[in-house]
Design a protein with these regions (language model features):
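Glycine-rich, anion-gripping cofactor-binding loops and their flanking helix/strand elements
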Residues: 49-66, 70-135, 154-157
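Short, ordered loop/turn segments at secondary-structure junctions
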Residues: 42-44, 73-76, 147-149
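Glycine-rich, acidic loop regions that bind phosphate or pyrophosphate groups
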Residues: 2-9, 14, 121-181
């Protein structure tokens, strides 16, 4: 488990993501959040092992955490295939820009988000989005759910093998289901 950026050419600066060594950290953050949001990208339908995909975990996390969901690219169709109706479609860069806007009141008009979980977005795109949020929305906490370390997130898993990553996601889901989000 290494906390080194997967993308070597970029330098994240002096402030790097804290490493998620215990999935309970993610569960506690979601529980404490007033307005959590989950952003899911197109790799969610491919990332995983066997019949377990990130999209399946995204549905479970969204339901258990009682959070809004933004699906980027064609991902909204994947949510519909899973029977999840609560996903809103928006381009990845658009949701990033809106989250940086202090005047934006959220997808439902109920106010700003205080926690954003991100997964399934191409590594280099997620890198740029998280960098923008780190610098232009500093009060927003971010969590990368992907298996490669994202230094611009507030919290990120280290570089993990697929099997270990899925175990961590299983623990996040079971923790959220136990605590009721």
């Amino acid at each position: 488990m290494r906390a080194e950026p997967w993308q070597k050419a970029e330098v994240p600066g002096p402030l790097k993501a804290s490493v998620i060594t215990k999935p309970e950290v993610v569960v506690a953050m979601v529980r404490r959040a007033r307005r959590p949001l989950l952003i899911v990208g197109p790799e969610a339908s491919q990332a995983g092992l066997g019949d377990r995909r990130l999209i399946d975990y995204a549905v479970l996390i969204a339901k258990a955490g009682k959070m809004g969901v933004v699906a980027t690219a064609q991902t909204v169709g994947e949510f519909l295939k899973k029977g999840f109706q609560g996903a809103v479609w928006m381009p990845a860069m658009d949701i990033a820009n809106r989250l940086c806007d202090p005047g934006w009141k959220g997808l439902d008009g109920a106010g700003r988000y205080d926690l954003v979980l991100v997964g399934g977005i191409h590594y280099y795109v997620e890198w740029v989005i998280l960098s923008a949020l780190k610098h232009f929305a500093p009060s927003l906490k971010t969590v990368s759910l992907d298996r490669f370390y994202q230094p611009h997130a507030t919290w990120s898993f280290p570089n993990l093998k697929v099997e270990e990553w899925l175990k961590q996601l299983d623990l996040v889901v079971s923790g959220l289901e136990k605590t009721g989000g």
